[in-house]
Amino acid sequence: YGMRLIQFPLGIFGVALATAILPTLSMHAAKGSFDELRETLGFSLRVIAFIILPATAGLILLRVPIIHLFFEHGAFSAADTVGTAAALLAYAVGLWAFAGIRIVVSAFYSMQDTKTPAIAAVIAMFVNILLALSLMGPLEHAGLALAAALSAMMNIAILISVLTFRLGGIDWWNLGQSFGRAVIATVPVVLACLWIASLAVWER
């Protein structure tokens, strides 16, 4: 159930944007216009940051009310809500990585490179297994979710490192500035979520 909620912003924004930019990235790659490819990639990552950071804040701060609203009925008890909320929290930590992978993989596909994303995915899979075995003891099912989030972070770290080498660098300065603005823009979302989470209606 936690992954279902993560898939909502991921599918609407991450996958949709990755699909939309692939033709543009492919056109730049075919022409050898790597400056334009870097610019398009950077723009896409900045857009994702502005969307995913507030979404992450909302999912983390409102995880219990959201699960209570959508799933807590019938055989799904209040205890199940608490358990699912723990998994959702762990998944949400890696939401930026799940979304970023879609964008970065599109850049590799535009350069006719499917091998590098596949290798990175295999490495991340083994890391996921090792982390899951290590974390599911102390954290139970939330450990499995956290393992998936951490392995996604490793996946995107590998992809970004290779892509930076391939493209001769990425505009980290603009990305950093955009990330900072996204953090600032997330503050009102955080305040609103804290207010909503404090409402007594969720305790009924």
Question: Residues of each region from the PLM?
Answer:
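Membrane-embedded alpha-helical bundles of multi-pass transporters/translocases
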Residues: 1-204
